[in-house]
Amino acid sequence: MKKILKSFFVFCAMIFFASCSSYNSVKRMQRMEEGVANPTTKEELEEAIKKYEKRAMDLALTDGQVGIWYKILGTRYLDQRLYGKAMECFKNAVAYYPDNANLYYYVAICAGYMAHTELDYEGNGASSAAIKKMNYLKLAENSYLQAISINPNYYRALYGIGVLYVFEFGEDEKAIPYLEKFLSTQLKDTDAMFVLARAYYSTYQYEKAVSLYDKIIELKPNAEKVQEAQANKSKVLEAQYQ
C-alpha cells in the first residue's frame, strides 16, 4: 500500500513540474515569437501592448501585464504633458485594475488639464468648447470621487477635488470637508491652507479663514506666501466687521 501511495505522489509531482515547464516554455516561445520581453521606451511599450492584446486569450496572465504597461506608458505621456494620450492610457489601465485608486487619480489630473486645452477648433461656437470643457471637469470630479471611495485617506485626491470645487465649479462648500481631511494629515501644507481659507471666506466662515491665515504666517513657508496671507487676512477682517 505504501509503495502504491509513493508511486501516486511521484506521478502527481511529475505532472505538476511538467505543467510548470510547459507553461514557462509557452511564455518563452511567445516572447521570442513576438519579440517582446521587457519594454522600456514609449515605442516598445506601445508595440508590446499591441502584440500582447492580440494574444491575451493565450495566457490569462498577460492581462495584468498589459494593464501595467498602460500605466507606465500613461506616466511617460504625462511627464511629456501629452495629457490626452496619457488619459487614454490610464482609462485603459482601469479596465484591468478597476480598484486601483492611483489610476483614477491620474485620469482626474489629465482630465483637468484637458479641460483647459479645449478650444473651438471646428468653429461651432463658444458653447461647443464650453460643453467639452465641462465634460472634462465632470470626468475629473467623478474620477477623484472614485479614487476617494477606494481609498478614503488618499490625500492627493482629497486635495485635487478640493481645488476642483473651489476654482473650477465655484462650489466652495463642497470642497471644505475634503480639504479639512487633507490637512488633518498634511499639517504643514500651506497651499491647501490657502485654498481652504478661500473656501471659508466664500462661505462666510471668517474666523476659520483668519485662523488659517495666522497659521500660514506662523509657519513662514516663504516671504511671498507670508505677505499674501497677511493681505488676505486683512481682507477677511474687513469683511467680517463691515
Regions found by a protein language model. Name each.
Residues 69, 103, 157, 192, ...:
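TPR alpha-solenoid repeat register
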Residues 20-76, 80:
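N-terminal leader/linker segments that initiate helical-solenoid repeat arrays
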Residues 59, 93, 146-147, 181-182, ...:
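Canonical positions in the second alpha-helix
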Residues 72, 106, 160, 195, ...:
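Canonical tetratricopeptide repeat
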Residues 191, 199-242:
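Terminal, low-structured helical/coil segments at or just beyond the last alpha-helical repeat
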Residues 34, 84, 109-142, 167:
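Short coil/linker segments at helix-helix boundaries
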